[in-house]
A protein has these predicted regions:
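Conserved N-terminal segment of class I S-adenosyl-L-methionine
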Residues: 1-121, 127-131, 144, 209-213, ...
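Short N-terminal helix/helix-N-cap motif within the alpha/beta-hydrolase-1
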Residues: 90, 138-142, 169
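A short glycine-rich, Lys/Arg-flanked "PGG" loop and its adjoining helix->strand segment in the class I
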Residues: 141-153
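Conserved beta-strand signature within the Rossmann-like core of class I S-adenosyl-L-methionine
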Residues: 155-161
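Short alpha-helix
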Residues: 186-201
Length: 262
């Protein structure tokens, strides 16, 4: 790769990374929400809440690493009860406030280090959400085993993680640049690596591994657009989703419904 190509990729990467954080801030600055949140949480896309159809009305659900509660409050409308915990003390108050505002009597959150032992007895949950969290952790297998411990034998794990092998990630790597999609990520995966990590933690997939949206170098610009116009963001997000269905190898990540290994 010549110097000009490397410089172009670097410039696009800078725009991509800054655009995501700009979109989050613009949501608050433009009054779409009184707090900073990613615009993807403000549009109604069925693939965003992909886990909801896998929940049942009588489920007791655990949300591991619930952060601002965006997924938790959505799941609460589907299940009997849900508990979320996280050690992000900046995000948890947002989750608690949303629970109060929406009068979700079946949901609660609390602060806890999710990398340690969970404060729950064995086999007490029928489903667990572990969404875009595993890549931020170091003791990943230990956390998966804790999830397996607190899940019933017939319980379901709804888990997602990032794809490191997309065409854009490979271009960044070839240019000698940091290729992970988030600077806080401790790991990203190929499809096979992700399934191997789940297996090491005691889980096996039920059905196919599902894509998310296209990993495009212009994702950050699209996120920034979302901070300004949710209508345009909606259309661009649908394009990314359709592209990922056509090219699952270039999806931003993987989504898996898993069960405890037998």
């Amino acid at each position: 790769m010549n110097l000009a190509a490397r410089a172009l990729i670097r410039a696009i990467d800078v725009i991509n990374r800054k655009g995501k954080s700009a979109g989050v801030r613009l949501v608050r600055l433009t009054g779409k929400r009184p707090y900073a949140i990613h615009p993807k949480h403000l549009v109604d896309h069925p693939w965003h809440d992909w886990y909801v159809p896998h929940l049942q009305a009588n489920d007791f659900v655990l949300d591991v690493g619930c952060a601002n509660g965006a997924h938790l409050v959505r799941a609460a409308t589907r299940c009997r009860a849900i508990v979320g915990f996280d050690y992000d003390l900046a995000q948890l108050p947002i989750a608690a406030r949303t629970i109060r505002e929406q009068a979700l009597g079946n949901a609660r959150v609390f602060a806890w280090d999710i990398t340690g032992a969970f404060p729950f007895p064995d086999r007490c949950f029928s489903a667990a959400l572990f969404l875009d969290v595993i890549e931020h952790l170091h003791p990943r297998v230990a956390v998966l085993r804790e999830i397996a411990r607190v899940l019933r034998d017939d319980g379901r794990l709804l888990v997602s993680g990032p794809n490191r092998a997309t065409r854009w990630r490979r271009r960044l790597e070839a240019a000698g640049l940091f290729s992970y999609s988030d600077p806080d990520h401790k790991i990203e995966y190929t499809r096979e690596e992700f399934l191997a990590e789940l297996a090491a933690g005691g889980f096996e997939p039920v059905g196919e591994v599902e894509p998310v949206v296209l990993d495009t170098p212009w994702a950050g610009a699209i996120d920034a657009v979302g901070g300004l116009s949710l209508g345009l963001y909606d259309r661009l997000s649908r394009w990314k989703r359709d592209a990922a269905l056509r090219r699952p190898q270039d999806s931003t990540g993987f989504r898996v419904v898993a069960r405890k290994r037998r």
